[in-house]
From Swiss-Prot:
GO terms for biological process: nor-spermidine metabolic process; putrescine acetylation; spermidine acetylation; spermine acetylation. Belongs to the acetyltransferase family. The modification N6-acetyllysine is found at residue 29. Acetyl-CoA binds at residues 94-96, 102-107, 133-135, 140. It comes from Homo sapiens. Homodimer. This is Thialysine N-epsilon-acetyltransferase. Induction: Not inducible by polyamine analogs. GO terms for molecular function: diamine N-acetyltransferase activity; identical protein binding; N-acetyltransferase activity. Keywords: Acetylation, Acyltransferase, Cytoplasm, Transferase. InterPro entries: Acyl_CoA_acyltransferase, Diverse_Substrate_AcTransf, GNAT_dom. Widely expressed. Under physiological conditions, SSAT2 is expressed at lower level that SSAT1 (SSAT). Many tissues express only SSAT1, several tissues express both SSAT1 and SSAT2, and bone, cervix, ovary and pineal gland expressed only SSAT2.
Length: 170
């Protein structure tokens, strides 16, 4: 098994991050939904007031190899606030390339996000998963996550594009 390192993303990683975002969307059967550009990822994640934070998983080259590290996974997270529980971290995306799954890389990304949550004083760590992705649900439960759909019956809603403009009267 190759050596893997989880680290904070750098601005120069945006091309790899976008590639992985597209792979995740394809896996989720939602590839037509990806509208983000590499430039937007740079502007939104690496300015003075970033909208998101990102971790990347990279495979380190074997000793003596000329190739550099290869980004094979990522996790994008940001901070939200719960009026009941306070500071919360939300993992928007987590993805590992298929050929690197089953090596604990996803778990390492999740554990690193948990470390960030504790360092920032967060009381909860939230994420969502499509209802057909049983492998991911099993992983999250094995790591100690609670399924809030089962436990509390929450449904999450989203106003997008035109619905937001209409709601805002614009």
């Amino acid at each position: 098994m190759a050596s893997v390192r989880i680290r904070e993303a750098k601005e120069g990683d945006c091309g790899d991050i976008l590639r992985l975002i597209r792979e995740l969307a394809e896996f989720e059967k939602l590839s037509d939904q990806v509208k983000i550009s590499e430039e937007a990822l740079r502007a939104d994640g690496f300015g003075d007031n970033p909208f998101y934070h990102c971790l990347v998983a990279e495979i380190l080259p074997a000793p003596g190899k000329l190739l550099g590290p290869c980004v094979v996974g990522y996790g994008i997270y940001y901070f939200i606030y719960s009026t009941w529980k306070g500071r919360t971290i939300y993992l928007e995306d987590i993805y590992v390339m298929p050929e690197y799954r089953g090596q604990g890389i996803g778990s390492k990304i999740i554990k690193k996000v948990a470390e960030v949550a504790l360092d920032k004083g967060c009381s909860q760590f939230r994420l969502a998963v499509l209802d057909w992705n049983q492998r991911a649900m099993d992983l999250y439960k094995a790591l100690g996550a609670q399924d809030l759909t089962e436990a509390e019956g929450w449904h999450f809603f989203c106003f997008q594009g035109e619905a937001t403009r209409k709601l805002a009267g614009k």
